[in-house]
């Protein structure tokens, strides 16, 4: 999954230091950098990409820039969303208080420094 960001260095710092993600890939690529991060123990990675002509075809750059600061549609599962909320809040992460959903579980919203939004959910 690709998450478009304005500054890869800032994004890597946030995802690794604040969210505790592992840096899976960080290498030069096409004049830029290819960076992938993942929650600890996960096989699924997020590619943190600056939307510029180095990594994308020129005709896709503007649309990708418009994706920065929007909902990613990505959900992460937590066994203990309330403890996760407290831990992330202490680290200065922009996170909403977990709210119980109609289906019985809880959900929080997290924003990265660019305003890209993710959901954290837990089972009822």
Locate the predicted segments by residue:
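Conserved phosphate-binding and hydrolysis motifs of nucleotide-dependent enzymes
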Residues: 7, 112-115
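Vicinal oxygen chelate
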Residues: 22-77, 82-111, 121-124
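Alpha-helical macromolecular-interaction surfaces
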Residues: 9-10, 83
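Conserved beta-strand-loop-alpha-helix junction that forms the acyl-donor binding cleft
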Residues: 4-8, 102
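Conserved active-site tyrosine of GNAT-family acetyltransferases
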Residues: 11-16, 88, 115
């Amino acid at each position: 999954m690709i998450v478009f960001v304005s500054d890869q260095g800032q994004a890597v710092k946030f995802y690794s230091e604040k969210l505790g993600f592992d840096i899976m890939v960080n290498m030069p690529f096409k004049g830029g950098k290819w960076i992938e991060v993942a929650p600890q123990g996960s096989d699924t990675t997020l590619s943190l990409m600056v939307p510029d002509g180095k990594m994308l075809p020129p005709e896709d750059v503007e649309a990708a820039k418009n994706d920065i600061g929007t909902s990613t549609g990505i959900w992460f599962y937590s066994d203990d969303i309330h403890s996760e909320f407290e831990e992330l809040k202490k680290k200065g992460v922009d996170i909403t208080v977990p709210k119980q959903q109609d289906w019985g579980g809880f959900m929080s919203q997290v924003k990265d420094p660019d305003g890209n939004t993710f959901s954290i959910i837990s089972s009822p």
